[in-house]
Amino acid sequence: MERNPNPNNLPVELNRTSLYLGLLFVFVTGVLMSSYFFN
């Protein structure tokens, strides 16, 4: 993995937050789809 110098100096937290938001989005979408199909 290359480490590019980041002018904003943002840590890994941004990637971690986007990862958690993606997992939350997939989870909510799965729950809504399952409730839609089972009703």
Curated annotation (Swiss-Prot):
InterPro entries xref list: PSII_PsbL, PSII_PsbL_sf
GO biological process: photosynthesis
UniProt GO cellular component terms: photosystem II reaction center; plasma membrane-derived thylakoid membrane
Keywords annotated in UniProt: Membrane, Photosynthesis, Photosystem II, Reaction center, Thylakoid, Transmembrane, Transmembrane helix
Membrane-crossing segments per the record: 18-38
UniProt membrane topology term: Single-pass membrane protein
Major localisation: membrane
Highest taxon in the source lineage: Bacteria
Record SUPFAM superfamilies: Photosystem II reaction center protein L, PsbL
Location in the cell: Cellular thylakoid membrane
Role according to the record: One of the components of the core complex of photosystem II (PSII). PSII is a light-driven water:plastoquinone oxidoreductase that uses light energy to abstract electrons from H(2)O, generating O(2) and a proton gradient subsequently used for ATP formation. It consists of a core antenna complex that captures photons, and an electron transfer chain that converts photonic excitation into a charge separation. This subunit is found at the monomer-monomer interface and is required for correct PSII assembly and/or dimerization.
Protein family per UniProt: Belongs to the PsbL family.
Subunit structure: PSII is composed of 1 copy each of membrane proteins PsbA, PsbB, PsbC, PsbD, PsbE, PsbF, PsbH, PsbI, PsbJ, PsbK, PsbL, PsbM, PsbT, PsbX, PsbY, PsbZ, Psb30/Ycf12, peripheral proteins PsbO, CyanoQ (PsbQ), PsbU, PsbV and a large number of cofactors. It forms dimeric complexes.
Name of protein: Photosystem II reaction center protein L
Organism: Synechococcus sp. (strain CC9605)
Gene for this chain: psbL
